[in-house]
Every structure is written in C-alpha cells, then in structure tokens.
C-alpha cells in the first residue's frame, strides 16, 4: 500500500513538474463568451510555451489574455514539435488542434511556426515551405492574420555549428524568417518580426538557444498586444 501510494505521488509529482514547465503537451483552450474578440494563437512549442516555468500563466497567449482583458478571448493552439510542411515528420495540419483552431472561428489568427521545419529531416526547401505556409494561412478564411516570424535560433556551448539543440538549423531558421516576411507582404498580412527582435535580445531565448524564456514570452505577448490594440 505504501509502495503504491509512493509510486502514485512520484508519478503525480512528475506530471505536475511537466505541466507547470510547459512539457506535458496538455491543451489549455476555453470557450469564448458572446461579444468577445476571438484570438487564436497558432504555432509550435514557442506558442505552446515549452520549458517556461509556471506555464499556465507564463506562456505568451496566457500573458496576452491578461494584457487584453475581458473584451478579448485568447486560445493557445500551439503544439510542440510540429511543422508547416506537409512532408515533415509532424505536420500541423494533421492535428486535432488544427481542426479546433479552425472551428474556433477566430477574428484574429496569430501565426508563428517554422522552427521544426528547419530540422534536417524536415527541410525540403524554400518553395515547399512557402506553398504549405500559404495553404495553412488561407485555410483560416476571413480571419485577420497576424503573421509572426519565428524566433531566432542560437548556437550553444554544446552545439556550435550547423545544428543547435532540438536539431534546429539556425541558418535555415533565418531563411524561413525571410520567406515569412515575403508571404506577409504578398498576402497583405500584419507582420510582427519576432525573428529580428529576438536576434537583438539573446536573453529572450532560453539556454537551449531555441525556445523563448519567460522574459521572451512576455515580450512576444507585448508585441502582439500592441498590434491588437492599434487594430481595435
């Protein structure tokens, strides 16, 4: 009995650690109220909030919700390890979360994705990425798209060339950011250049060189907030 209880506590404690540090993969979407402006934050682990302490409060969509207040409803549709490209190992469009983000009928879609596309096993090339990015964005219909470039990726002490942690290729990340800028101009989307901002603020990115820190998540939320307030 004691052994079973101890095991349960261990498992429960382990899950709690994963949950509160943004590693459980659990969703935190809720229902919007009538009259609220709906904001769907779509993306990968950057949007989800991977590795951020006290994740339920400190992922960037949660911070954005607090900044915007009751007149807005923000849902986090970020899913770690997923990618734009349909040929990748984990295409975002194959997810139930993707279908849920469509059904949410958002007024604004804040889209930030591409880090996992940069992995050697996923990267097919600029044309394929551009085509699949356009397909994804167009699937949101009449929603206003706020298109964010992905955060800059940095080499670390353990990863000094070609590929950094999580198999991310910083040079390909730079290329993906440029493609995203071009797509925003082509489609007339609102652009937030998170890639350029994070390049100037290494402290916005955690020690792994890839994921935003708590400070970085707050900075991203502030940038999105500034745009939404200007729009409304």
Please report, for each region that a protein language model flagged, where it lies by residue.
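Alpha-helical cap/lid subdomain in secreted, periplasmic
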Residues: 2-3, 93-232
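Low-complexity, intrinsically disordered short peptide segments enriched in small/polar/basic residues
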Residues: 6-8, 34, 71, 76, ...
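Short, mixed-charge, low-aromatic patches
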Residues: 13-25, 48-58, 86-94, 134-137, ...
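Conserved SGNH/GDSL esterase-like catalytic core that processes O-acyl groups on lipids
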Residues: 36-40, 46-131
């Amino acid at each position: 009995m004691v052994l079973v209880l101890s095991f349960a506590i261990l498992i429960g404690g382990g899950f709690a650690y994963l949950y509160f540090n943004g590693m459980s993969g659990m969703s935190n979407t809720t229902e919007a109220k009538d009259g609220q402006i709906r904001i769907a934050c779509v993306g990968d682990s950057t949007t989800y909030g991977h590795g951020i302490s006290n994740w339920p409060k400190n992922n960037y969509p949660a911070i954005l919700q607090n900044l915007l207040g009751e007149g807005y409803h923000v849902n986090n549709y970020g899913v770690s390890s997923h990618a734009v490209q349909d040929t990748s190992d984990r295409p975002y469009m194959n997810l139930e979360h993707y279908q849920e983000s469509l059904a949410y009928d958002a007024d604004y879609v804040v889209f930030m994705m591409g880090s996992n596309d940069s992995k050697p096993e996923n990267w097919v090339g600029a044309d394929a990425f551009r085509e699949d990015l356009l397909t994804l964005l167009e699937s949101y219909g009449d929603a206003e798209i706020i298109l964010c470039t992905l955060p800059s990726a940095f080499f670390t002490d353990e990863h000094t060339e070609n590929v950094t942690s999580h198999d991310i290729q910083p040079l390909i990340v730079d290329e993906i950011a440029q493609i995203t800028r071009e797509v925003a101009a082509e489609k007339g989307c609102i652009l937030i250049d998170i890639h350029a901002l994070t390049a100037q603020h290494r402290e916005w990115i955690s020690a792994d060189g890839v994921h935003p820190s708590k400070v970085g998540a707050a900075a991203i939320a502030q940038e999105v907030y500034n745009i939404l307030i200007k729009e409304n």
